[in-house]
Amino acid sequence: MAGYEYVSPEQLAGFDKYKYSAVDTNPLSLYVMHPFWNTIVKVFPTWLAPNLITFSGFLLVVFNFLLMAYFDPDFYASAPGHKHVPDWVWIVVGILNFVAYTLDGVDGKQARRTNSSTPLGELFDHGLDSWSCVYFVVTVYSIFGRGSTGVSVFVLYLLLWVVLFSFILSHWEKYNTGILFLPWGYDISQVTISFVYIVTAVVGVEAWYEPFLFNFLYRDLFTAMIIGCALCVTLPMSLLNFFRSYKNNTLKLNSVYEAMVPLFSPCLLFILSTAWILWSPSDILELHPRVFYFMVGTAFANSTCQLIVCQMSSTRCPTLNWLLVPLFLVVLVVNLGVASYVESILLYTLTTAFTLAHIHYGVRVVKQLSSHFQIYPFSLRKPNSDULGMEEKNIGL
């Protein structure tokens, strides 16, 4: 598996023909954030590789996730009667979240500024974004947590899926239309949540216990905003863009079945993970919510990355992500009845396997495309083909 090549020769040829096409109509992005990013990008030296900026932002998101996992492992820290997350942690998380969002906004501008734009850069950016979804949602959950003043772990599980499906819809659109319509919800959510983290440090988590309108709690507003944004903005706009392309006869695929193929694995992942929760003899989501969320988010990111590769290379998306086979077997075993400790071992084993498999997939795809385009992923220096090929062989990946 060390030298396994995930990107086929057909897909590599498709990447050679790829041209970036995106539409951003979000007023916040157009009139506030882009001017801000245009100023910020000038701070970066011209020798700094865009992918290094992208990866740095991703690492900040992961750091926030780990920091909050340390102070709030089971999502009870914001509940009454429990030891709360220190105020300085909220400030750090808020600042780092906004910095990560800023880095995600300037990486493409740095690529154009240094004349180093490649399909690898876009794939690297959007691939990491797909994994960031679970880190972002789970970290935000600590603001309210579970308990009498929060939301249940199952409700958060459903909200996580709302975010995941909202993310993949944009890439499903591009798979079918050839154009990436950037979602409005991303910019709004990043700016809002960064602000809310800081406010939490100032007013304390107790401020979120109180109703802000009649008996409508802030946790209800949190839930309503996520669902409302998905149902009233993301989904309608995705369907509108799809049907516009259908009406203009510009869809890349002629079959409804083929158009829906990219959504099969994510939907199956939702069905299997939900079945596990409902059939779990030990109530696995209550026992290990953070690990379960991470397992789902990692498997989802892997399916999304496969879609992005196919979308960018104009090749057919695989119907089934094979990571779902072991998940199916685990759900089958759980349904037959197992001891609580066995189910926990299965969850941790599966999560570890998914994580290693996804990291391997990402590393191999980046190395393949780096070799194909004759570039280094984290440097603007240009290697010759012999040196790059020898380097990859020596690394043994």
Curated annotation (Swiss-Prot):
PROSITE patterns found in the cross-reference section: CDP_ALCOHOL_P_TRANSF
Residue numbers of N-acetylalanine PTMs: 2
Clinical condition linked: Spastic paraplegia 81, autosomal recessive: A form of spastic paraplegia, a neurodegenerative disorder characterized by a slow, gradual, progressive weakness and spasticity of the lower limbs. Rate of progression and the severity of symptoms are quite variable. Initial symptoms may include difficulty with balance, weakness and stiffness in the legs, muscle spasms, and dragging the toes when walking. In some forms of the disorder, bladder symptoms (such as incontinence) may appear, or the weakness and stiffness may spread to other parts of the body.
Record key words, sorted: Acetylation, Disease variant, Endoplasmic reticulum, Hereditary spastic paraplegia, Lipid biosynthesis, Lipid metabolism, Magnesium, Manganese, Membrane, Metal-binding, Neurodegeneration, Phospholipid biosynthesis, Phospholipid metabolism, Selenocysteine, Transferase, Transmembrane, Transmembrane helix
Matches recorded under Gene3D superfamilies: 1.20.120.1760
Segments crossing the lipid bilayer: 47-69, 84-103, 123-145, 150-172, 179-201, 221-243, 256-278, 291-310, 317-339, 344-366
Membrane association type: Multi-pass membrane protein
InterPro entries (UniProt xref): CDP-OH_P_trans (IPR000462), CDP-OH_PTrfase_TM_dom (IPR043130), CDP_ALCOHOL_P_TRANSF_CS (IPR048254), CHOPT (IPR014472)
Family: Belongs to the CDP-alcohol phosphatidyltransferase class-I family.
Reported tissue expression: Widely expressed. Abundant in brain, placenta, liver and pancreas, followed by heart, skeletal muscle, lung and kidney. In brain it is strongly expressed in cerebellum, followed by the occipital pole and the frontal lobe.
Name under which the protein is recorded: Ethanolaminephosphotransferase 1
Signal sequence region: none
Function in brief: Ethanolaminephosphotransferase that catalyzes the transfer of phosphoethanolamine (PE) from CDP-ethanolamine to lipid acceptors, the final step in the synthesis of PE via the 'Kennedy' pathway. PE is the second most abundant phospholipid of membranes in mammals and is involved in various membrane-related cellular processes. The enzyme is critical for the synthesis of several PE species and also catalyzes the synthesis of plasmanyl-PE, a lipid required for proper myelination and neurodevelopment, from 1-alkyl-2-acylglycerol.
GO BP: ether lipid biosynthetic process; myelination; phosphatidylethanolamine biosynthetic process
EC number: 2.7.8.1
Names of required cofactors: Mg(2+); Mn(2+)
Location in the cell: Endoplasmic reticulum membrane
Gene Ontology CC entries for this record: endoplasmic reticulum membrane; Golgi apparatus
Primary enzyme class: transferase
Any GO molecular function: ethanolaminephosphotransferase activity
